[in-house]
């Protein structure tokens, strides 16, 4: 019989990293939802974690949340206003695909097992959202995440 392997971690680091690493083997980064970290910042974090430690991450909110979302304002995201409707809700747009490429760039450093795509409450079920999500996920590269 196969044994299930369960990993338990937190969303972010609620205590110092050195203390966290003594207890947990994985973390889910929430910061990546608000802003994509710089390459240098991502490499610094990756170099701080134990070799077998798993860094999972949330995808950048511009892919899943519309530009009118309060979380965009909180994150201070600036975009060309004429393209605002092209972001969020997993729309299969150039802007969302470019944002996903930025997520992948950081994911190549962290090597997560999971990239969480958090959708807002306003992303309800309807035919358009389903069509957009299907096309988005059929188009993007996963790179084994």
Task: Locate predicted features.
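Residues lining hydrophobic/aromatic ligand-binding pockets adjacent to catalytic sites
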Residues: 1-145
């Amino acid at each position: 019989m196969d044994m299930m392997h369960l990993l338990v971690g937190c969303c972010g680091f609620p205590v110092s990293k050195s203390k966290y690493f003594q207890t947990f083997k994985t973390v889910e980064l929430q910061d990546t939802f608000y802003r994509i970290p710089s390459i240098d910042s991502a490499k610094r974090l990756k170099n701080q974690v134990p070799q077998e430690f798993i860094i999972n991450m949330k995808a950048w909110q511009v892919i899943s949340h519309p530009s009118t979302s309060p979380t965009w304002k909180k994150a201070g995201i600036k975009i060309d206003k004429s393209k605002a409707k092209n972001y969020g809700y997993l729309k299969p747009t150039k802007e969302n695909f470019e944002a996903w490429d930025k997520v992948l760039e950081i994911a190549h450093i962290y090597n997560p097992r999971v990239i969480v795509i958090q959708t807002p409450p306003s992303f309800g079920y309807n035919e358009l959202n389903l069509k957009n999500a299907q096309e988005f996920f059929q188009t993007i590269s996963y790179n084994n995440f």
